[in-house]
């Protein structure tokens, strides 16, 4: 569901055929996207699997947060598993060699994973807010059974609508070789994309930023939590906001520029060519979350400081210097 009416597939060597009437040079992203997706796949797959294994052991009846993070990582894994075929597609100049049905499935899985990840990040922020700001009012909702139902509901909410409209969104056309793309985009699809960009970024970002502010404010007033626990909670919420702004932000911003431009620009093809490279770059970095999301596991560990030090050596060195400074200060005070 991209810059494109999902009526996907055109013959690569004839740029004026259906799907690429603009004659866009698809070699422009033929190195960048395959290399980037290859890096994400090689590093992200084992990283997410290891984090999933660790999170599974953290699930307790009174701690449901790992359930939502596990589902976030499952969404990342689904996305990562589509990369080998996308690597082949982009390396061959947007030429899909695996048939229209596999394109339909890969496109569906890819975007379901993106939007499921966004929804689960919102749920993680909400769960932390309820646990900190309203622990008694919503205690009955913070149990494993309820968390599993919430997770299942999110997957259904994300997957069922496109599945129902499967043939309409991803029509099966045997003679085309573009996948999930058409240039220029059509009016109805442009409107659809602008709506999805609003629902999948502007609203969730406002929701997460608002919860971050309120949760941190409530956290400062709580004396029963240790400084390390507070640091862990703040770190998790800050990571959520950072992922939204730095990873999802460029793609959604350039997407808005692209589709608004298509509505007002006199020549759709000239505009499609102008924004093609920036949009594809942002689309590639959209999957950076597959490397960042496993970091949530660190913030859920009770030995957060030690684990963070092992994963992030710079933090370990800073902690060592801090301890040395503290010991020196205490020693000098003792001599006085």
Predicted features by range, described:
Residues 41, 71-83, 150-162, 197-205, ...:
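Alpha-helical transmembrane segments of multi-pass membrane proteins
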Residues 183-186, 197-201, 216-254, 271-275, ...:
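Intracellular effector-coupling site of seven-transmembrane GPCRs
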Residues 1-24, 227, 231, 267-269, ...:
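Intrinsically disordered regulatory tails of 7TM GPCRs
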Residues 29-38, 62-124, 131-141:
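Extracellular TM2-ECL1-early TM3 structural module of rhodopsin-like
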Residues 114-152, 214-216, 220, 297-305:
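Class A GPCR helix-loop hinge within the 7TM core
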Residues 1-50, 183-184, 192-193, 197, ...:
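Extracellular N-terminal segment of 7TM GPCRs
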Residues 43-46, 78, 113-120, 206-210, ...:
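Residue-level signal for the membrane-embedded core of alpha-helical transmembrane segments
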Residues 14-26, 90-113, 134, 139-151, ...:
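Loop architecture of class A 7-transmembrane GPCRs
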């Amino acid at each position: 569901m991209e810059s494109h009416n999902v009526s996907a597939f055109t013959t690569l060597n004839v740029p004026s055929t259906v799907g690429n009437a603009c004659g866009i040079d698809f070699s422009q992203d033929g190195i960048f996207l395959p290399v980037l997706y290859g890096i994400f796949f090689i590093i992200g797959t084992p990283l997410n699997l290891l984090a999933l294994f660790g999170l599974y052991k953290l699930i307790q009846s009174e701690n449901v947060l790992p359930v939502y993070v596990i589902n976030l990582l499952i969404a990342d894994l689904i996305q990562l598993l589509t990369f080998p075929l996308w690597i082949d597609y982009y390396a061959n100049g947007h030429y899909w060699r695996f048939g229209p049905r596999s394109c339909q499935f890969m496109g569906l899985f890819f975007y379901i994973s993106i939007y499921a990840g966004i929804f689960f990040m919102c749920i993680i922020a909400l769960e932390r807010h309820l646990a900190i700001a309203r622990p008694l009012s919503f205690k009955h909702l913070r149990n494993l059974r309820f968390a599993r139902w919430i997770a299942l509901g999110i997957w259904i909410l994300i997957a069922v609508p496109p599945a129902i409209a499967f043939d309409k969104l991803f029509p099966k056309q045997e003679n085309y070789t573009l996948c999930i793309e058409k240039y220029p985009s059509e009016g109805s699809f442009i409107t659809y994309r602008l709506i999805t960009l609003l629902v999948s970024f502007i609203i969730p970002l406002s929701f997460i930023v608002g919860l971050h502010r309120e949760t941190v404010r409530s956290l400062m007033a709580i004396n029963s939590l240790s400084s390390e626990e507070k640091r862990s909670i703040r770190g998790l919420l800050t990571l959520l906001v950072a992922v939204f702004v730095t990873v999802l932000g460029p793609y959604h911003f350039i997407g808005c520029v692209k589709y608004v431009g298509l509505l007002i620009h006199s020549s759709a093809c000239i505009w499609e060519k102008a924004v093609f490279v920036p949009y594809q770059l942002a689309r590639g970095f959209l999957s950076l979350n597959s490397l960042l999301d496993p970091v949530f596991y660190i913030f859920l560990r009770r030995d957060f400081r030690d684990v963070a030090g092992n994963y992030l050596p710079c933090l370990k060195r800073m902690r060592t210097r801090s301890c040395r400074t503290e010991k020196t200060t205490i020693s000098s005070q003792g001599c006085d």
